[in-house]
UniProtKB/Swiss-Prot annotation:
Source species of the chain: Danio rerio (Zebrafish)
Keywords: Chromophore, Disulfide bond, G-protein coupled receptor, Glycoprotein, Membrane, Phosphoprotein, Photoreceptor protein, Receptor, Retinal protein, Sensory transduction, Transducer, Transmembrane, Transmembrane helix, Vision
Cytoplasmic side: 69-80, 141-159, 238-259, 317-354
Transmembrane intervals: 44-68, 81-106, 121-140, 160-183, 210-237, 260-283, 292-316
UniProt protein name: Opsin-1, short-wave-sensitive 2
Gene behind the chain: opn1sw2
Length: 354
């Protein structure tokens, strides 16, 4: 029992948060042997298939978004820069995260070793954080353009570029510390993908403070930004709809934008809510046992965002969708369907003047 309590200090590159009736826990290293003691082979194969789907679908839809934006000039608006940034970060996670997890789940252990774990953990964290902060920037930019809190402020190319650079800076601020000694990257969940150490406490890695830093800096702040900006946007649109009660198009825009905002906020919570809740629970319940299969879910939901975020922010955007249909299937969609009635970035035409 004494040896088990020292385990977090003895192993620099992994942690086994379950009790094993063995004298040599290193023999169960997730870098050396299949983790059959953590779950049935069917669980690993199912996760492998899921990661393969995320890799293929995530790569395809995000590459399509980038290529489509390059091909069609009308998509290269300042407000769409951040959507391309989101697609790049999603593609980053698909290539460096989902593909690695697919093979690791297939082998049932992290075959790429401790160094590979640090690389995969870092790259996945960077991609995830860029995606997270990009969603906050999307909300902020739409608030600035539609609600016009700065009066006659004009959103220009430098602002759009700054909005794309900001998420990468924030991501580096979140992803670099575990490489520098504040927390660490280790296998998580079923030990087939890597991320920050949520599990261990009271050690030299100071994981508790890092988890709280991530919760505040990378969840609470972006989420508060999203809720505030979209809340203000909805208020603005309701006022515009009330002022133009006889306009069917304005009423339709308000309804569709409201649905879009609900979907956006819900999508953010699905992606990052479980991670935030799980991390806080682990820190608040030090030493409490938990099912590693359940601990895999937050990571999977974050990787799955590479597919459902483009669906929310790109495919539900009629202008993007019409261009994609034309590029892939050579099929034209009627111009009125490609209008921006459901597109938050272009509903400023119904916003009241200030």
């Amino acid at each position: 029992m004494k040896q088990q309590q020292q385990t977090p200090e003895l192993f620099e590159d992994f942690h086994m948060p379950i009790t094993l009736d063995v004298s040599n826990i290193s023999a169960y290293s997730p870098f050396l042997v299949p983790q059959d003691h953590l779950g049935h082979s069917g669980v690993f194969m199912g996760m492998s298939a899921f990661m393969l789907f995320l890799f293929i679908a995530g790569t395809a839809i995000n590459v399509l978004t980038i290529v489509c934006t390059i091909q069609y000039k009308k998509l290269r608006s300042h407000l769409n820069y951040i959507l391309v940034n989101l697609a790049i970060s999603n593609l980053w996670v698909s290539v460096f995260g989902s593909s690695v997890a697919f093979y690791a789940f297939y082998k049932k252990y992290f075959v790429f070793g401790p160094i590979g774990c640090k690389i995969e953990g870092f790259t996945s964290t960077i991609g995830g954080m860029v995606s997270l902060w990009s969603l906050a920037v999307v909300a902020l930019e739409r608030w600035l353009v539609i609600c016009k809190p700065l009066g006659n402020f004009t959103f220009k190319t430098p602002h759009a570029i700054a909005g794309c650079i900001l998420p990468w800076c924030m991501a580096l601020a979140a992803g670099l510390p575990p490489l520098l000694g504040w927390s660490r990257y280790i296998p998580e969940g079923l030990q087939c993908s890597c991320g920050p150490d949520w599990y261990t406490t009271n050690n030299k890695f100071n994981n508790e403070s890092y988890v709280m830093f991530l919760f505040c800096f990378c969840f609470a702040v972006p989420f508060s930004t999203i809720v505030f900006c979209y809340g203000q946007l909805l208020i603005t649109l309701k006022l515009a709809a009330k002022a133009q009660a006889d306009s069917a198009s304005t009423q339709k825009a308000e309804r569709e934008v409201t649905k879009m905002v609900v979907v956006m906020v819900f999508g953010f919570l699905i992606c990052w809510g479980p991670y935030a809740i799980f991390a806080i629970w682990v820190v608040s319940n030090r030493g409490a046992p938990f099912d590693l299969r359940l601990a895999t879910i937050p990571s999977c939901l974050c990787k799955a965002s590479t597919v459902y975020n483009p669906v929310i922010y790109v495919l539900m955007n009629k202008q993007f969708r019409s261009c994609m249909m034309k590029m892939v299937f050579n099929k034209n969609i009627e111009e009125d369907e490609a209008s921006s009635s459901s597109q938050v970035t272009q509903v400023s035409s119904v916003a009241p003047e200030k």
